[in-house]
């Protein structure tokens, strides 16, 4: 064991590829935590750096030269692109600069469609004026520039490297890799074209930083191969450096690891939250902790994979994890792209979002398809709103960016409410979106509060859009509830994305078709803006995987492999042939998101006979019909987000309350005594440093003022107008 009096220097790596528009947050989270311990760390997004090298003038010159010198036979599209190579080489640097938001005037020539070379991706371009409007020049140009990059990506996949993808690399090798054999074979093959760029970039960083420990995060199967390539290079060329591996892939797939060959590429593999395992590992490298006393860490001892968990140190509480630190990452070099012309869908690829977690784990933690037995779901721990907003302020100061994506499994409504109040209380400008459950806590008023604090969008699981299956999933919601909550968000001006699932055990063809009809009606009624269908995947750590008999399925690969063990093959004898529906579901939704085909028969999306839907044509419309509101609960919070009113003219026992709203001057005619009471009371209800009132107090103050029957007042026109202006019960 190396003995040293100083802390080892850490180098965090995100390997290719994750997102083009914003950093994956794992390394920033861990760097922020190490800051609290005074430990030096450096981080790099090697995926971004490889992309920027590849998509540059020199990068394309080298790429086209490589293609011309190879014996690979190109398809017709590739041959066209080769003929247009000078146009690609000439335009690539200006386009990348435009996607960095540094060359905005280029939008005008891109949008005219006579500047960029066009290959097969542009065949999908239809009515861009309809999609972006006559004034949406920059967005239209960003979409066209994205298609241009995707054309080049297609050429790379066809002619150079079939593993390439903008947000993943060699993903197939990481999926369901119960055996390490194929991945090991690929890692011992000569470096690919992309590998060459990767290791060149990695080597420069290693020589620059001279770390003692390289910690590689692999959140997804599409990062695994590159992560191990990085480890392989380091261990071969810099054997004095230790390599640790962790992240989402290890947490879900490698919990029963027995494969010693993986330790040719890394020295340590850690599971679950990384803070304490990392600190313990650094103590070990420093010589102050025995190997056996590491936390949730695999290593290879005498040729045998050994799980080390002798540490008595607890996991770090959320209040102590520190502030995510994006230092070292070139935040101005990320590429904002628009893959499809949909305002909600673009959030995943357009804009630089600071990532932050409101609460660790999932407060619901019951969904039967989910890995609820694993720490990242089951160990729920919230942070306080003031501390979260302290972190928001610090990250805005650090990055110069006020856009946030709260990356919770499902953000808790009560905490969202408190964070929104704290943002408003501090008078901050924040733009944010997050993942939610469509639960009844999201009332109209709460959604209005969220939008006032800067919320622009939410994403959540509708999953199977069938009440029987939602109950089987233990989702805790119904289709009607999802529709109502989505409507509340939409009425407030918040975009809604739904995660959709097909192929859950026992799902019939009829239920699949009915789910599609529900989705069609949600889009048609304007309460769902985008969605994504994925086929149910059985995992070993989910309730379904742990108890398959209860869901009438048969596991086909029950014996665990030596490497990855999470995805399970299964047979669903009582369900339909789920794979048959895949193309039709995805094709219909893609069109619905563009406002196309909403009046087409469902049968038209499929090339085989499907059952007629049993969902009434007005099913969602009926659910969304207005209904009488209940009197608020006594302990509900009540706040005023509008301006403090002033008293205008008074005559004949009536007075005019005047308020300057953002766009309008509003006058409210009320009884004189009520007007005086409202001026004082609304000021006290305003979100500020004082305590927040509850509804019971509001009612008592009204009664104390002797203003008449409260129910009549609350259900009357005055309160109706005040609620539209910002009197919210939350």
Region locations from a protein language model:
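Radical SAM enzyme core and accessory elements
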Residues: 2-15, 35-36, 50-168, 187, ...
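Glycine-rich beta-alpha loop elements in corrinoid/cobalamin-binding modules
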Residues: 9, 17-20, 25-59, 70, ...
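N-terminal [4Fe-4S]-dependent radical SAM core
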Residues: 183-186, 306-355, 666-668, 728-730
